[in-house]
């Protein structure tokens, strides 16, 4: 079954991570249909992460199988990031060769907290690339929108004074437009 969890710690905007079962090369015929049905959501994903054990000599064929199955469910146009895990099990020459072969891949060891944080930042960087930073002035008479701002936008800074709140946010243009309309009322 597919597991869906928010990226932790919580992010604004919320990023949901969907973990599907791993790809198995010789899947029994009776499981193929149910397996593919769990992948239908991949076609509507914003970003696909291919997490692969870089120390497994057969990871390239596993990656090929993954890409073929995703093509079958119509997910070839979905942006993706190749994540090569278990870099701690590779020698320096192996790691250098893989970095040359997969220059856009993200290399990590899930045993290393800094690597996990860097992956989280890379994921957030993808989602924040289309966002803009803006400063909003919210008078005390319009404080009702603050909860919505906190729910949908990343707060960069906030300052209260005698007239209200000045808040600097990072958000999608759509969310900013909606909040500005509410503030203009």
Language-model features: where?
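NTP-binding/hydrolysis catalytic cores, primarily Walker-type P-loop NTPases
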Residues: 132-185
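Canonical P-loop GTPase G-domain recognition
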Residues: 76-81, 87-140, 144
């Amino acid at each position: 079954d597919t597991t869906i969890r928010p990226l932790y710690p919580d992010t604004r905007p919320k990023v949901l991570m969907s973990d599907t079962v791993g790809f198995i090369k010789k899947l029994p015929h009776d499981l193929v249909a149910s397996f593919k049905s769990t992948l239908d959501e991949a076609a509507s994903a914003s970003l696909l992460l291919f997490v692969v054990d870089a120390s497994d000599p057969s990871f390239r064929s596993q990656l090929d199988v993954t890409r073929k199955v995703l093509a079958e469910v119509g997910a070839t146009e979905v942006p993706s990031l190749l994540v090569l895990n278990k870099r701690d099990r590779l020698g320096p020459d192996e790691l250098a060769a893989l970095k040359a072969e997969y220059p856009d891949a993200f290399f990590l060891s899930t045993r290393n907290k800094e690597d996990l944080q860097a992956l989280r930042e890379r994921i957030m960087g993808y989602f924040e690339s289309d966002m803009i930073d803006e400063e909003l002035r919210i008078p005390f008479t319009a404080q009702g929108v603050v909860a919505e701002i906190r729910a949908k936008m990343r707060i960069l800074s906030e300052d209260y004074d005698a007239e209200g709140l000045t808040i600097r946010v990072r958000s999608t243009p759509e969310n900013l437009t909606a909040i500005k309309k509410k503030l203009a009322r």
